[in-house]
């Protein structure tokens, strides 16, 4: 579940030829989009083993929503139900099948993660403090931005963010073990009518709660 934490959502756009425009669009996104919700599909591909001819992959689907500052929710619905909620203070991870909740301080675990970038500040300063940014080549009808964490000790190695017509379309995330997670978003609702109470999480009755 902690690896899914890395997935978690936003930079913005830019092609090699339009980096200035991409920065302006990113700044506009951070400034003008304070909340949002979308559906997503996620494909996680593990490095191919010596005995394998094809890399292993798993697909899951769900919904995502966020509210600045520092609140977001991932609801994984298929093939297994899992919930990741940041309420502004704590990060909650709930595995329905295990009936287990893991609670961590957001400050301790988010740091340089895609989710923190989506739901954190409203300007570029924090983004450039945490990541080395460079434009990627346009591909598949998307404009790409590459972000490499300045903290080299974390699990996250690289985030590639694809935008289409100013809308977040794809997050392509690579971790230190070579695992790749690609989230493709759909049905975005920018500035959705969300409130802080929507991100409150209460452990279900009978669930075991772990606080590492």
What are these regions (language model features)?
Residues 1-5:
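Positively charged n-region of N-terminal signal peptides that target proteins for export
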Residues 6-11:
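Sec-dependent N-terminal signal peptides
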Residues 14-17:
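N-terminal signal peptide c-region/cleavage motif recognized by signal peptidases
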Residues 21-46, 94-157, 211-212:
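Flexible, processing/modification-adjacent segments and terminal tails
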Residues 28-29, 65, 81-85, 135-137, ...:
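Short linear motifs in intrinsically disordered
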Residues 31-88:
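N-terminal mature ectodomain segment of secretory-pathway/periplasmic proteins
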Residues 63-115, 181-182:
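An acidic-aromatic
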Residues 90, 102, 126-212:
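Gly/Pro-enriched, hydrophobic low-complexity segments
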């Amino acid at each position: 579940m902690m690896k899914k934490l890395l997935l978690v959502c936003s930079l913005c756009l830019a092609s090699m030829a339009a980096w200035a425009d991409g920065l302006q669009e990113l700044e506009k996104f951070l400034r003008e989009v304070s909340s949002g919700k979308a559906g997503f599909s996620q494909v996680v591909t593990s490095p191919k083993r010596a005995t394998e001819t094809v890399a292993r992959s798993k697909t899951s689907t769900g919904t995502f929503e966020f509210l600045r500052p520092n609140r977001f929710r991932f609801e994984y619905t298929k093939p297994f139900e899992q919930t990741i909620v940041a309420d502004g203070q704590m990060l909650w991870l709930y595995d329905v099948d295990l009936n287990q909740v893991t609670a961590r301080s957001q400050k301790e675990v988010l740091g340089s993660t895609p989710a923190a970038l989506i739901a954190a500040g409203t300007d570029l300063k924090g983004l450039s403090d945490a990541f080395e940014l460079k434009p990627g080549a346009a591909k598949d009808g998307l404009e790409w931005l590459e972000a490499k964490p300045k903290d080299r000790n974390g699990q996250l190695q690289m985030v590639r963010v694809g935008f289409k017509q100013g809308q977040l379309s794809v997050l392509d995330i690579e971790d230190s073990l070579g695992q790749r997670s690609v989230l493709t978003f759909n049905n975005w609702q920018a500035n959705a009518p969300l409130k802080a109470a929507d991100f409150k999480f209460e452990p279900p009755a009978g669930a075991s709660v772990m606080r590492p």
